[in-house]
Design a protein with these regions (language model features):
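Short helix/strand-bridging catalytic loops that position acidic/His residues to coordinate divalent metals
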Residues: 47, 51, 82, 122-128
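Conserved C-terminal portion of the radical SAM core fold
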Residues: 57-117, 134-159
């Protein structure tokens, strides 16, 4: 196609076949090909709870099929899914770092109108540990310290339309304002991405 220089494809890790991977690998010799997969969590218990209908083992297998094929590989991760503790969330950084990814997009959990989670949140809000903006900034400071240093973080937060967002509100803070506060917190803590990363890192207990 004239003027097309590449493709960025975002999908689920269980929605791509070896046949498609091989085809895209051929295209990658001439075009830029980026594949981004919705990992969302590295815990099978969470993936089952939120009805993802795939396992983390399937996610890892998909990345294995895609590595060394000429692709730019990315991952999406949701921070704060129901039932996950701070230790679970920090362990995501350790597990994600083992994947052959180039980029990572982080999304803090948001409850939006007319979703299944909106119904669950209304009926059982105690099952949700939604971050305040201050707590999220503090958490991300710890998270990036455990993350492999060569992974490019392309996004720190999501931003649902205000007319659809139920929680958390964060007083209308914009993405760029949160990123600026994260930068400031990293400087204050004298920490940086990968400061505590080790190839043989064990899960946080």
């Amino acid at each position: 196609v004239p003027k097309v220089v590449g493709l960025v494809i975002g999908t689920r890790p269980d929605c791509i076949s070896e046949e498609i991977i091989d085809y895209l690998s051929v295209l990658s010799k001439k075009y830029f090909i980026s594949l981004e997969f919705g990992v969302e969590s590295t815990l099978n218990s969470t993936l089952k709870k939120v009805n993802r209908c795939h396992t983390y083992e399937e996610t890892k297998a998909t990345y294995e099929l895609c590595k060394n094929k000429g692709f730019h590989l990315g991952a999406h991760l949701i921070i704060g899914l129901p039932g996950e503790t701070k230790e679970d969330l920090l362990n995501h950084a350790i597990e994600i770092s083992k994947l052959p990814i180039d980029t990572l997009k982080l999304h803090h959990l948001q409850i939006v109108k007319q979703s299944i989670m909106a119904f669950q949140y209304k009926n059982n809000p105690e099952n949700f540990n939604l971050f305040t903006s201050e707590n999220y900034i503090d958490f991300i400071t710890d998270f990036v310290g455990l993350l492999r240093p060569d992974i490019i973080i392309e996004r720190f937060v999501s931003e649902a339309p205000q007319d659809l967002l139920i929680a958390p509100k964060w007083n209308g803070l914009k993405n760029f304002e949160i990123v600026a506060k994260i930068d400031q917190k990293l400087a204050e803590q004298n920490t940086w991405q990968g400061k505590f990363y080790r190839e043989d890192s064990q899960l946080v207990k």
